[in-house]
Amino acid sequence: EVAGISFGGQMHGLVILDEKDQVIRPAILWNDGRTTKETDYLNQVIGKEKLSEYTANIAFAGFTAPKILWVKENEPENFAKICKIMLPKDYLAYCLTGVHCCDYSDASGMLLLDVKNKCWSEQMLEICGVSREQMPELFESYEKVGTLKPEVAKELGLPETCLVAAGAGDNAAAAVGTGTVGDGQCIVSLGTSGTIFISSENFGVDPHNALHAFAHADGHYHLMGCMLSAASCNKWWMEDILQTQDFAKEQAAIQSQGRNHVF
């Protein structure tokens, strides 16, 4: 019998709901690059030092706060309708429970969370023109958000007592799955994006580098470096440069011993 459900999913995407909890517009996802202007404004006008003070991070085009500013500037009619701001996986949790929720690891990537103190940053909310009431309730990844709504339980064939936990952003969830928890553990992940993920029991931030300082799903923190294109680069190298799709053959040809870090 299923006792609990949780979610792990892509981070940073903007899902906005109206007063009836209906989605106002299609979600703007993490890899959408339309927010260059808004990102430059945050980094250059507000300043990286201030952003780091408020959120422990600097602005990137994929983060959620620049997306909110983009909607505010380009779709004022939609911005005016916003009653709740959510992330993609958390919207699914809302559909199951009726609770507007977000875990700390995923919230860290919004550029709206005071990561050190684990609360919404009043300064960033003001900069984006939104209120605390428009933000979801915050949870640790392992905390219970609620239980299934009766109609959802019936549709899924699950008991109404089935709990729903907050879950985590995709990289934090994957890190837990690989044992990258506690202090000083590292994982390299190559998917649609590429990340280097280092778990830490201590909080540290440097506004002069491009590392993300996020809350981790284990209740501590992590540092993460990210690039938007990773595994697809391997595909490009194979198909466009080597002119082959025989990945197994190329893998077998890789030398086990190399020289000067070339294999």
Residue ranges and their predicted role:
Residues D32:
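Carbohydrate-associated surface elements
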Residues E1, L29, N43:
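N-terminal phosphate-binding loop and adjacent alpha-helix
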Residues F7-M11, S141, L190-S193:
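Glycine-rich beta-strand-to-loop/alpha-helix junction loops that act as flexible
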Residues C128-E140:
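A conserved helix-loop-beta module that forms one wall/lid of the active-site cleft
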Residues T36, N43-I58, P66-C101, L111-E122, ...:
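Active-site core segments that coordinate phosphate-bearing ligands/cofactors
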Residues E1-R25, E53, K81, E137, ...:
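N-terminal glycine/serine-rich phosphate-binding loop of ATP-dependent small-molecule kinases
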